[in-house]
Design a protein with these regions (language model features):
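Eukaryote-specific, cytoplasm-facing alpha-helical/coiled-coil scaffolding segments in long proteins
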Residues: 109-117
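Papain-like cysteine protease catalytic cores
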Residues: 10-109
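A recognition module on extended beta-rich or small alphabeta surfaces enriched in W/G with H and D/E
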Residues: 117-133
Length: 133
């Protein structure tokens, strides 16, 4: 079950990937790339549901990303209501992300000039890309 990673990669366009010379949408390589960009200042450009992250929250997201086992992606990704990887994708690619979890809207907003908005949704067992605007 790699639906989380499939959803994120389906929402990214060639222009997004070209920003970092990412040549293809290989999930393992993409996660490895994200892990190399896991730096404190990256998270300071993102608002989650309108709020900037606190220093401790950033540290916790960084720790989760650092310890993420890429080999486990085929067992699914437990998407958090404030997910460190979605924060990272939002900041790195300068994209807003609207995540609808069941009936709850969760917003990741890049503080700066955005390049687009990813609309995704999930439930207790599935995550998918819906559209990009």
């Amino acid at each position: 079950m790699t639906c989380f990673w499939d959803g994120i990669l389906n929402g990214l366009q060639k222009e997004d990937l070209n920003l970092y010379d990412i040549l293809n949408k290989n999930k393992e390589a993409f996660i490895t790339f994200l892990k190399t960009k896991n730096e404190f200042d990256i998270f300071k450009n993102v608002r989650w549901n309108g709020f900037l992250l606190k220093k401790q929250e950033i540290k916790e997201h960084m720790e989760m990303i650092k310890n993420y086992d890429i080999r486990g992606i085929y067992n699914g990704h437990l998407t958090s209501t404030c997910d460190g990887f979605l924060l990272l994708v939002c900041s790195l690619f300068k994209l807003n992300i609207n995540h609808r979890y069941l009936s709850c809207n969760i917003r990741y907003k890049y503080d700066g000039n955005i390049r687009g908005t990813l609309n995704v949704r999930s439930n207790r067992g599935h995550f998918e890309f819906i559209s990009r605007s």
